C-alpha cells in the first residue's frame, strides 16, 4: 500500500477531494478504510476537514464501517475537525480558504456526520418518575419544575432541520433523549450507603405509600357520596414529611433537631422511586459511555461508547448524601437522598461482563455547595487510589466550631482543605459578599503600587458591565489575556506585601481568599487546579456533579437575611458552564476517549424581579418563598452546559 511523505494513502486524498466514485472504487479493492497517516488521521478525518465538499464521502465511509471514534495525535475525532481544512498539510491555495473555519459550514458538516453516526451523539436521560418526589409546596426551591424547565427548553430548541447560523438551537441528530433505563438496584446503593439507612428509607416509603393509597380510597368514597368524581390527591394529601429531622433523630442522635417547618428536604410516597431512578440514570449512562460493541466489519470487539457523553437530568440531587444520608456536621440533607454520582462511580469501578472495567474514575463537583456526602463516600472507599474527588465551591466559615452549634455562613460549611491521601481536592472560593475583605487581604496600605494593582484586578472584573457579561462575551479573552493580565497584577501585589501581611499567615485572611471571588476565581480554579489534576490522574471516566446554583442571581448561592434582603455569593454566566464543559471534555478526549457523564445537582432559579426577596429563617431554608422561582436563567445555564458536551471544540 503506497503512502506519501506524510503517511497518507489514496483513500485520504480521495476523501479530501470529496470524490465519492474514487472512494467507492478503493473500497471495492479492499483498501483499508481506517488507515491512519503520520498524524493518526483517517480518511474520515480528511473528509470531515474538507467541509461541505466531503459530506457525501463522510456518509459513504460511515455506512461502510469507518470508525468515528478514532483519535488523531491531537486527540480529536473526525467530528471535532469538521471544516477545519488542511492548514498544516500543504500550500494548496484552494485549501487556504478553509483556514478560517466558517461556523455555519462547521455545523452543517457535523450534522451530516451525526445523522449517520449515533455513537458521536450526546445522551440526555430523564424520567417521569423523577417528578414524583414531591416538595412541601410549589414555591419550594427543589421542585419537579426544575426538570420540566430544562426538558421543555431543550424540546423548544431542538429541530430536525434548523439553520446553521443559529448556534442557540440543537439539531435533533446531535442528541439522543431517552427515558429507557432502570432504577438503581439495592446492591448498587449498598456500595455507597449503609444498610440501616437504606432500610430506614425503604420503610418510610412503604409507610407513606400506604397512607397515600388510603387517602385515595377515602377521596373516591367521598366523591361517590357527593357525586363528584375528583379522586386525585391535593398537595396537602401527599403525606409529605420533613426528612432531615427524621435522619437527625435516627442516625445522628441529636437532642436538638431541625424544626419541621425549616426542613428543606422532604420525603413523599414517590421519593424512593425517584431517587432510585436518578441513580439508575447515572448507572445507565456509565454503561452507554463505556461499553463493548461488536464490529461486524472489523470482526473483532472494539472499545467504544454507544454515546460520546451523557447528561442526566434527574432529581432528587445527591452530592450531600453521605453513608447515612445526613452528615453529622451538616445540619441539613441539602435536598439529597441517594448519592447519584458516587453510585455511578462505584458502578464504573466494578467488574461488569458487558463492558470493560474502569481502573480510575474522577468525580468533578461544580455545584455552588461543597459535595460533602460525596467526599465522605470517597474517603471511606476501600481503594481510594482509583477515585479522585474535586470540588470547587463557595466557602464562608469564620472560625472552627467549638460547640455542636452550626456556625457556618454558607451550607454545608465544609471543604476548606484537601485530603491528599484520599485523592480529595477542595477549592473553596470566597463569596462575593466578602469581596471587600478579599481585596483588603491583598492590599498593601503603605505601598501605592500594590494597592493600585489590586484596584485594577480585584479578582473579578471591576465594572458592572464586566460582572454582568452577556452572551456575547468572548470566552477566549475571558479565560486568556484578561485572566493572565489580572493574574500578573495580583502576583505583583502579593510580591510587594510584607510577609507578615500575606493572607496565609493572618487569621483574618483565610488562604482561599487568594483565589479571589466571582467568575474569575471560578475559572482560575478550573484552569489551574482541576485540569492539571485530571490530566495527572488520567481517569478512564469523568463524572460531573453539575449544579447550576452558582449562576448569577440563583437563590442557591445567596445568603438570605431575616429582613428580606439577600447577598449573592457567585455570578457565573451561561457561558461559564459551556466553557467548563468544553475544558473537561478536552481533558477527557486525552485521557478516556471523551467519556464524561454529567449529573444534575443544584440550581433552583431566581426570585422574580417584581417580588421582593422573602425573609428566610436561615441561609439553607426556603420555606418562606411565596412564589415559584423564575427558572429561565437556570434552564439557559443547562442549555449552555449541554452545548459544551455536544460540541467541545466550538469556537
Located regions from the model:
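Leucine-rich solenoid repeat scaffolds
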Residues: 62, 68-103
Amino acid at each position: 500500500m503506497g503512502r506519501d511523505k506524510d503517511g497518507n494513502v489514496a483513500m485520504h486524498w480521495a476523501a479530501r477531494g470529496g470524490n465519492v466514485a474514487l472512494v467507492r472504487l478503493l473500497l471495492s479493492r479492499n483498501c483499508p478504510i481506517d488507515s491512519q497517516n503520520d498524524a493518526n488521521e483517517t480518511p474520515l478525518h480528511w473528509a470531515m476537514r474538507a467541509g461541505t465538499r466531503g459530506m457525501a464521502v463522510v456518509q459513504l465511509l460511515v455506512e461502510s464501517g469507518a470508525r468515528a471514534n478514532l483519535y488523531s495525535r491531537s486527540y480529536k475525532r473526525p467530528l471535532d475537525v469538521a471544516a477545519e481544512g488542511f492548514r498544516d498539510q500543504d500550500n494548496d491555495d484552494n485549501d487556504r480558504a478553509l483556514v478560517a473555519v466558517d461556523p455555519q459550514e462547521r455545523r452543517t458538516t457535523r450534522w451530516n456526520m451525526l445523522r449517520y453516526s449515533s455513537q458521536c451523539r450526546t445522551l440526555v436521560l430523564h424520567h417521569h418518575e423523577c417528578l414524583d418526589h414531591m416538595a412541601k409546596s410549589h414555591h419550594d426551591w427543589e421542585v419537579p419544575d426544575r426538570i420540566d424547565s430544562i426538558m421543555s427548553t431543550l424540546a423548544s430548541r431542538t429541530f430536525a432541520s434548523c439553520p446553521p447560523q443559529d448556534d442557540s438551537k440543537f439539531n435533533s441528530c446531535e442528541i439522543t433523549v431517552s427515558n429507557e433505563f432502570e432504577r438503581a438496584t439495592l446492591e448498587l446503593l449498598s456500595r455507597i450507603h449503609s444498610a440501616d439507612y437504606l432500610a430506614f428509607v425503604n420503610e418510610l416509603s412503604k409507610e407513606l405509600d400506604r397512607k397515600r393509597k388510603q387517602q385515595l380510597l377515602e377521596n373516591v368514597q367521598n366523591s361517590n357520596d357527593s357525586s363528584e368524581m375528583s379522586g386525585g390527591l391535593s398537595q396537602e394529601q401527599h403525606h409529605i414529611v420533613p426528612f432531615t429531622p427524621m435522619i437527625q433523630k435516627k442516625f445522628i442522635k441529636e437532642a436538638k433537631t431541625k424544626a419541621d417547618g425549616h426542613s428543606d428536604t422532604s420525603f413523599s410516597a414517590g421519593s424512593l422511586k425517584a431517587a432510585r431512578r436518578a441513580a439508575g440514570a447515572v448507572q445507565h449512562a456509565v454503561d452507554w459511555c463505556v461499553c463493548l460493541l461488536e464490529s461486524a466489519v472489523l470482526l473483532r470487539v472494539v472499545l467504544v461508547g454507544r454515546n460520546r457523553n451523557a447528561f442526566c437530568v434527574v432529581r432528587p440531587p445527591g452530592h450531600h448524601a453521605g453513608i447515612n444520608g445526613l452528615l453529622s456536621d451538616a445540619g441539613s440533607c441539602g435536598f439529597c437522598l441517594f448519592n447519584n454520582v458516587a453510585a455511578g462511580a462505584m458502578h464504573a469501578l466494578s467488574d461488569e461482563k458487558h463492558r470493560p472495567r474502569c481502573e480510575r474514575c474522577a468525580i468533578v463537583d461544580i455545584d455552588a455547595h461543597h459535595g460533602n456526602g460525596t467526599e465522605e463516600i470517597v474517603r471511606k472507599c476501600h481503594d481510594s487510589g482509583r477515585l479522585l474527588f474535586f470540588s470547587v465551591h463557595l466557602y464562608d466559615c469564620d472560625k472552627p466550631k467549638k460547640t455542636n452549634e452550626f456556625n457556618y455562613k454558607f451550607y454545608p460549611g465544609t471543604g476548606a482543605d484537601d485530603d491528599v491521601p484520599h485523592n480529595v481536592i477542595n477549592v473553596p472560593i470566597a463569596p462575593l459578599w466578602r469581596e471587600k475583605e478579599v481585596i483588603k487581604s491583598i492590599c498593601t496600605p503603605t505601598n501605592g503600587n500594590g494597592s493600585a494593582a489590586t484596584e485594577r484586578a480585584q479578582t473579578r472584573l471591576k465594572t458592572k458591565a464586566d460582572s454582568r457579561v452577556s452572551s456575547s462575551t468572548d470566552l477566549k479573552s475571558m479565560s486568556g489575556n484578561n485572566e493572565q493580565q489580572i493574574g500578573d497584577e495580583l502576583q505583583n501585589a502579593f510580591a510587594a506585601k510584607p510577609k507578615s501581611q500575606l493572607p496565609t499567615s493572618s487569621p483574618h485572611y483565610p488562604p482561599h481568599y487568594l483565589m479571589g471571588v466571582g467568575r474569575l476565581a471560578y475559572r482560575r480554579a478550573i484552569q489551574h487546579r482541576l485540569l492539571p489534576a485530571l490530566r495527572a490522574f488520567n481517569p478512564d471516566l469523568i463524572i460531573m456533579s453539575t449544579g447550576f446554583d452558582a449562576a448569577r442571581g440563583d437563590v442557591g448561592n445567596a445568603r438570605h437575611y431575616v429582613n428580606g434582603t439577600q447577598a449573592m455569593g457567585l455570578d457565573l454566566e451561561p457561558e461559564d458552564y459551556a466553557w467548563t464543559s468544553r475544558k473537561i471534555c478536552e481533558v477527557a478526549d486525552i485521557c478516556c476517549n471523551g467519556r464524561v457523564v454529567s449529573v444534575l445537582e443544584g440550581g433552583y432559579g431566581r426570585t422574580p424581579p417584581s417580588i421582593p426577596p422573602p425573609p428566610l429563617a436561615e441561609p439553607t431554608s426556603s420555606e418562606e418563598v411565596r412564589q415559584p422561582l423564575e427558572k429561565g436563567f437556570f434552564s439557559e445555564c443547562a442549555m449552555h452546559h449541554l452545548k459544551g458536551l455536544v460540541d467541545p471544540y466550538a469556537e
